[in-house]
């Protein structure tokens, strides 16, 4: 039976729109409303950032979202409750982007079991080298969760082959050197990375870090990307509307709809 993530990428001729939000930002109930708005706008895969006190891969926009979530006492229990409610609302694939310390403190088996029971389809551990991922990857497989990995411009071809052997679902291609955050253009190096990774695997390839406009999406589409990942631009909309959740939902639906339209062209 085809999994939810695999089903998204099986739709030929269309690029998947992967929308990111920090779970629990700015609080549990608003976070659920944000997730539903992203889904209503047309998000193909929903990526929840698990808030962490030292998110080394994230720029200031997402760091502030993490801070808001932690300030509202977001815990793994909160996050799994959010996922359960979103899963009851939609069959859209749900992916976690987390850091290893969160999994370790919960217990690897317990974390993946609870993720599976809540309805999570994939987990990306941002600070886990593939060489140290055997236990996590085996636990993910045990519970039917896709282990997703990052590939960067500095990833060697040899290391890429190792990543490909461990990865399921899709590969997250980091478009720039540095942290997350909106950029003006898609770097030519990102498109070169896409071509290089494509020669190593048939897994779907999604480009993230710095994607924020329909023009960015079109550029990625023309280069042959299977998906685009948008985070900071979404979190920025949340931040600008913290005092007005209704306007926040409306702006999120509108933004995702425009980006989704570009992904389908």
UniProtKB/Swiss-Prot annotation:
Q: Name one GO cellular component term.
A: cytosol
* Xref: Pfam families: Trp_syntA
Query: What is the enzyme's main class?
Result: lyase
Q: Does the keyword Transmembrane helix apply?
A: no
The record's section on Gene3D superfamilies has: Aldolase class I
Which terms are listed as keywords in the entry?
A: Amino-acid biosynthesis, Aromatic amino acid biosynthesis, Lyase, Tryptophan biosynthesis
Family recorded in the similarity comment: Belongs to the TrpA family.
UniProt-recorded name of the protein: Tryptophan synthase alpha chain
Q: Provide the gene name from the record.
A: trpA
């Amino acid at each position: 039976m085809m999994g939810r993530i695999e089903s998204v990428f099986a739709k030929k001729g269309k690029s998947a729109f992967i929308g990111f939000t920090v779970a629990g930002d700015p609080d549990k109930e608003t976070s659920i409303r944000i997730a539903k708005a992203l889904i209503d706008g047309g998000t193909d895969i929903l990526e929840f950032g698990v808030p962490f006190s030292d998110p080394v891969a994230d720029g200031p926009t997402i760091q502030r979202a993490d801070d808001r979530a932690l300030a509202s006492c977001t815990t793994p229990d909160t996050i799994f409750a959010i996922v359960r409610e979103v899963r009851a609302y939609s069959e859209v694939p749900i992916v976690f982007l987390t850091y290893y310390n969160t999994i370790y403190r919960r217990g690897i088996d317990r974390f993946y079991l609870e993720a599976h029971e809540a309805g999570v389809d994939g987990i990306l551990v941002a600070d886990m080298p593939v060489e140290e991922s055997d236990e996590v990857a085996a636990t993910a497989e045990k519970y039917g969760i896709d282990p997703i990995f990052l590939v960067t411009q500095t990833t060697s071809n040899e290391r890429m082959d190792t990543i490909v052997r461990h990865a399921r679902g899709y590969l997250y291609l980091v478009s720039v050197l540095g942290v997350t955050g909106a950029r003006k253009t898609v770097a030519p190096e990102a498109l070169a990375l896409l071509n290089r990774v494509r020669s190593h695997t048939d897994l779907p390839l999604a480009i993230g870090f710095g994607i924020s406009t329909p023009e960015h999406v079109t550029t990625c589409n023309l280069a042959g990307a299977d998906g685009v990942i948008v985070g900071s631009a979404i979190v920025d909309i949340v931040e600008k509307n913290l005092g007005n959740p209704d306007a926040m939902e409306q702006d999120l639906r509108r933004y995702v709809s425009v980006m989704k339209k570009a992904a389908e062209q």
